[in-house]
């Protein structure tokens, strides 16, 4: 049995959870999330907690046990607190700005790269070089942050590019010429 899956998930005061078989709907102050969990687990609400249990001792059920518990816990935390990822743009002339729901990134290409925010995601820019991606769905926030980073990943020689806040870039020495 999964050590992560065994622990029950407490439901905060302002969050309501409704279960319909494997379909889980979580409503909170930040929004609403719906997800259908894979087969192999059962989800029950006991008092003010959610309990996820495997349906059998098959390998697939045991594998999905901890996954499903974490997915539901992330949904509850997302609608109550929300998630955010911060990115930094490093390099001369590289900057970002928000126009409505669109993030416009100038990252050294001949044209600015535009990214439309999906539903439930917001972009914020500070000082033209710090981008914050925030929303209620942890998976969607992480995917959008990864897409922004993929526009211009940091290079190892000068460290220019788009990186996560706090990310260490492994630097390389340039080539040393013949002497």
Curated annotation (Swiss-Prot):
UniProt cross-references to InterPro entries, sorted A to Z: Ribosomal_uL6-like (IPR000702), Ribosomal_uL6-like_a/b-dom_sf (IPR036789), Ribosomal_uL6_a/b-dom (IPR020040), Ribosomal_uL6_bac-type (IPR019906), Ribosomal_uL6_CS (IPR002358)
Keyword Signal tagged: no
GO cellular component annotations of the record: cytosolic large ribosomal subunit
Biological processes, Gene Ontology terms: cytoplasmic translation
GO molecular function: rRNA binding; structural constituent of ribosome
Keywords from the UniProt entry: Ribonucleoprotein, Ribosomal protein, RNA-binding, rRNA-binding
Any single Pfam family the record assigns to this protein: Ribosomal_L6
Family recorded in the similarity comment: Belongs to the universal ribosomal protein uL6 family.
UniProt-listed NCBIfam families: L6_bact
Quaternary structure and interacting proteins, as annotated: Part of the 50S ribosomal subunit.
Function: This protein binds to the 23S rRNA, and is important in its secondary structure. It is located near the subunit interface in the base of the L7/L12 stalk, and near the tRNA binding site of the peptidyltransferase center.
Protein name: Large ribosomal subunit protein uL6
Organism ancestry: Bacteria, Bacillati, Cyanobacteriota, Cyanophyceae, Synechococcales
């Amino acid at each position: 049995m999964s050590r992560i899956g065994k622990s029950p998930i407490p439901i905060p005061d302002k969050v309501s959870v409704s279960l319909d078989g494997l379909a889980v709907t979580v409503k909170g102050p930040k929004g609403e999330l719906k997800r259908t969990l894979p087969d192999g687990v059962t989800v029950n609400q006991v008092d003010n907690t959610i309990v996820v249990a495997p349906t059998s001792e098959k390998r697939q059920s045991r594998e999905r046990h901890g996954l499903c518990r974490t997915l539901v816990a992330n949904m509850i935390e997302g609608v109550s607190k929300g998630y955010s990822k911060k990115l930094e743009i490093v390099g001369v002339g590289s900057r970002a700005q928000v126009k409505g729901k669109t993030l416009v990134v100038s990252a050294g290409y001949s044209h600015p790269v535009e990214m439309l925010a999906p539903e439930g995601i917001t972009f914020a820019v500070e000082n033209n070089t710090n981008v914050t991606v925030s929303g209620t769905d942890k998976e969607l926030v992480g995917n959008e942050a990864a897409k922004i980073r993929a526009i211009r990943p940091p290079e190892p020689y000068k460290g220019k590019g788009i990186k996560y806040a706090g990310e260490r870039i492994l630097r390389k020495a340039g080539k040393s010429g013949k002497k």
